[in-house]
């Protein structure tokens, strides 16, 4: 069988503070929305197009997101895509999310200092 790769790398801005919950087993999970932008030519000008990505972080990365990630922060994440679905009113709704395995805080609005900048890089990897 040949090997396959499912790897996503995103650099973008956090849309809102992380939504952090604890499972019944006591495991932390965080959901973060990140925006990425690109410029595309449209009628002689460049139009900016924004894409929103749903990120899911577990355990230590969820804790790091809860402690250090805020709306407006610029972050780098690596992970893999996962697809699923759920039912709502008898309709199947498809979902897509990035399961994050590495998180790096790149910058904060207004230059606020984040303690995450003092951590060694391996502390930000699951």
Question: Which role does the model predict for each range below?
Answer:
Residues 42-67:
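A beta-strand/beta-hairpin structural motif
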Residues 1-36:
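OB-fold ssDNA-binding interfaces and closely related basic DNA-contact patches used
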Residues 9-16, 34, 71-82, 100-103:
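OB-fold and OB-like beta-barrel modules that bind single-stranded nucleic acids
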Residues 58-93, 106:
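Beta-rich strand-turn-strand
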Residues 1-5, 20-25, 41-48, 89-92, ...:
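Acidic, gly/ser/pro-rich intrinsically disordered tails
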């Amino acid at each position: 069988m040949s090997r396959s790769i499912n790897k996503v790398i995103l650099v973008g801005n956090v849309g809102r503070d992380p939504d952090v919950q604890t499972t019944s087993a006591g495991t932390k999970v965080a959901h973060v929305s990140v925006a990425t932008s690109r410029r595309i030519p449209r009628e002689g000008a460049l139009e900016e197009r924004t894409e929103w990505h749903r990120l899911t972080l577990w355990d230590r990365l969820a804790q790091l997101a809860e402690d250090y990630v805020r709306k407006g922060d610029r972050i780098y994440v690596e992970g893999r895509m996962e697809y699923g679905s759920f039912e709502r009113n008898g309709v199947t709704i498809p979902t897509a999310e990035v399961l994050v395995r590495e998180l790096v805080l790149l910058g904060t609005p207004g230059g606020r200092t984040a303690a995450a900048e003092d951590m060694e890089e391996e502390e930000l990897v699951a």
